[in-house]
UniProtKB/Swiss-Prot annotation:
The modification Phosphoserine is found at residues 85, 156, 159, 285, 287, 509. GO terms for cellular component: cytosol; intracellular membrane-bounded organelle; mitochondrial matrix; mitochondrial outer membrane; mitochondrion. Residues 92-137, 174-227, 247-292 are annotated as: Disordered. It comes from Macaca fascicularis (Crab-eating macaque). The lineage of its organism: Eukaryota, Metazoa, Chordata, Craniata, Vertebrata. This is Mitochondria-eating protein. Key regulator of mitochondrial quality that mediates the repairing or degradation of unhealthy mitochondria in response to mitochondrial damage. Mediator of mitochondrial protein catabolic process (also named MALM) by mediating the degradation of damaged proteins inside mitochondria by promoting the accumulation in the mitochondrial matrix of hydrolases that are characteristic of the lysosomal lumen. The gene is SPATA18. Keywords: Coiled coil, Cytoplasm, Lipid-binding, Membrane, Mitochondrion, Mitochondrion outer membrane, Phosphoprotein. GO terms for biological process: mitochondrial protein catabolic process; mitophagy by internal vacuole formation. One of its GO terms (molecular function) is cardiolipin binding. It is found in: Cytoplasm, Cytosol; Mitochondrion outer membrane; Mitochondrion matrix. Residues 1-273 are annotated as: Interaction with YWHAG/14-3-3 protein gamma. Residues 123-137 have a biased composition (Polar residues).
Length: 538
């Protein structure tokens, strides 16, 4: 910029301009109109050249200032001057500095009437502030909840420690009493033997009778004391089991509140172990925490897990399938069939597991009347020995040969492994209840039962027949514990018949090698009836 400024000064253009103005003023009255116009145009051209050089210097100076420096100066001085100059030139009036500039007019209009963008920004700011306040409130609530959970957990741990300490004291007292009784018995035996040696033969029989009566009385007292202590010990063990269950529930709830998304089930690691009860009898001892839980508590926990599977795990599985399948009906059919197959496989696995437990416990309970109770207690204590991964593989194989969802193969059912594993674990644990829980039988085209099912939102609420099922109903004997969900449409019976005929033709087609593999596998495990293959199994 300094070079341009030096060049402008060295040209002496402004001095020449002043000299021309003075000479024109002297000759103005003697010149003609054309001569005056020529002088004026020459001056304008010279001024334009000077002005061009000044604008170049202005541009260079603005560039040296960066992106932000000089912006306010240009807005406050250059823009109003250009506006006034162009306005005066267009109207033929001299430049008046008192005329309000266009920039000032724009500023006044902007302050007077804010633009929609400004209003949107203000609305977004207000929404952001409210969201931040809500987030802070939720964080405070979460911190308070975690604090309460921690306090409850500490109280439960203290109660558990106190109960264990009391049990240890009772065990010590029991050992002390047993030692005293043994010492008393030994002392009584020694006295009786001495008396038998010192007294004559006639009194020896009387002494024996007295000693036997004393021994019977002592044994009776010992039995009563031992039974009392055993009752107290059993009650304390039951209290410890309940406290342990509450502690585990609180720990699971606190871990779920800390994690934002449901992680893979931690039970899957323990359930993937060997399911052989014979080895478990040698290595593991029955845990009182599981065996002493009441049937009502286990039933309530399983119902809660089954409800969570319907409300959360089912929707997660639908989201996974919707990435590969666009049709919502197919997705819901796949999830329903997966649930039904999971219950079927879990029930079969429970029967085999109970048979193995019977075989392994038979030598230990020969001639005992509590054999069935021992089997039930062992099964309840060792539900984590269930090989859920093997059941998941069986369910996926059964789904691969189901004609309703496997032809044509549009998705790999391994996507649903986590969902199937959770349903298998729930169904397996439900078989250990008294009485066991099971799902209701459902077939496409059946009459809609309002006691068992709810209609889905996209159903025809006047249709009497079920087009397909979304979720099975949960039954206890013949009573409905939890309703399922079904879709009802007009003409559902004929649609089911047509789909069944198509399934038969496709499953028996020699062109598709997958159907042949599925039929061979199915003939080994289940009945090859096409109706049984086409409809859900239990």
């Amino acid at each position: 910029m300094a070079e341009n400024l030096k060049r402008l000064v060295s040209n002496e253009a402004l001095r020449t301009l002043q000299e021309k103005l003075d000479s024109w003023l002297k000759e103005y009255n003697t010149n003609t109109c054309d001569q005056n116009l020529n002088h004026c145009l020459e001056l304008i051209e010279q001024v334009a050249k000077v002005q061009g050089q000044l604008f170049g210097i202005l541009t260079t100076a603005a560039q040296e200032g960066g992106h932000n420096d000089g912006v306010e100066t240009i807005k406050s001085r250059l823009l109003p001057w250009l506006e006034a100059s162009f306005t005066a030139a267009s109207m033929g009036k001299p430049v008046d500095s008192k005329v309000p500039s266009l920039q000032n007019t724009f500023d006044r209009e902007r302050r007077k009437d804010p633009s929609p963008r400004d209003r949107d920004m203000q609305q977004l700011d207000s929404n952001l502030n409210s969201t931040r306040s809500q987030l802070n409130q939720v964080q405070d609530d979460l911190a308070e909840t975690e604090k309460n959970l921690e306090e409850t957990k500490n109280r439960s741990a203290i109660s558990l420690l106190a109960a264990e300490e009391e049990i240890n004291q009772l065990k010590k007292q029991l050992k002390t009493l047993q030692a005293q009784e043994d010492a008393r018995h030994r002392h009584t035996d020694q006295r009786s033997s001495e008396n038998r040696r010192s007294e004559p033969r006639s009194s020896e029989e009387r002494r024996c009778e007295q000693w036997s009566s004393l021994k019977r009385n002592a044994d009776q007292r010992d039995t009563e004391v031992t039974s009392d202590y055993k009752k107290q010990l059993r009650n304390l063990k039951e209290e410890i089991a309940v406290l342990s269950a509450e502690k585990s529930a609180l720990q699971g709830r606190s871990s779920r509140s800390r994690s934002p998304s449901p992680a893979p089930r931690s039970r899957s690691c323990s359930r993937s172990r060997s399911a052989s009860p014979s080895t478990a009898v040698k290595v593991r001892s029955p845990s009182p925490n599981r065996s002493k839980l009441s049937n009502v508590a286990r039933k309530a926990a399983l119902l809660s897990r089954f409800s969570d599977s319907y409300s959360q795990a089912r929707l997660d599985a639908q989201c996974l399938l919707r990435r590969c399948i666009d049709k919502a009906e197919t997705v819901q059919r796949i999830i329903y069939i997966a649930t039904v197959e999971a219950f079927h496989v879990a029930k079969m696995a429970f029967r085999h597991f109970k048979i193995r437990v019977r075989k392994s416990l038979t030598p230990s309970y020969v001639g005992s009347n509590d054999f069935e109770n021992a089997v039930s207690d062992y099964v309840i204590c060792h539900l984590d020995l269930y090989d859920s991964q093997s059941s998941v593989n069986d369910v996926i194989r059964a789904m691969n040969v189901n004609p309703k969802i496997s032809f044509p193969p549009v998705v790999d059912f391994c996507l649903l492994s986590d969902f199937i594993q959770e349903i298998c674990c729930i169904a397996f644990a439900m078989q250990a209840l008294e009485p066991p829980l099971d799902i209701a039988y459902g077939a496409d085209g059946e009459v809609f039962n309002d006691c068992k099912y709810r209609r889905s939102y996209d159903s025809d609420f006047t249709a009497p027949l079920v087009l397909y099922h979304v979720w099975p109903a949960l039954m206890e004997n013949d009573c409905v514990i939890m309703k399922g969900e079904a879709v009802t449409r007009r003409g559902a019976f004929w649609n089911s018949v047509r789909s069944l005929s198509r399934c038969r033709s496709r499953s028996l087609s020699p062109i598709c090698p997958r159907s042949q593999i599925g039929l061979s596998t199915m003939s080994r495990s289940r009945s090859p009836s096409p109706i049984r293959c086409g409809l859900p199994r239990f």
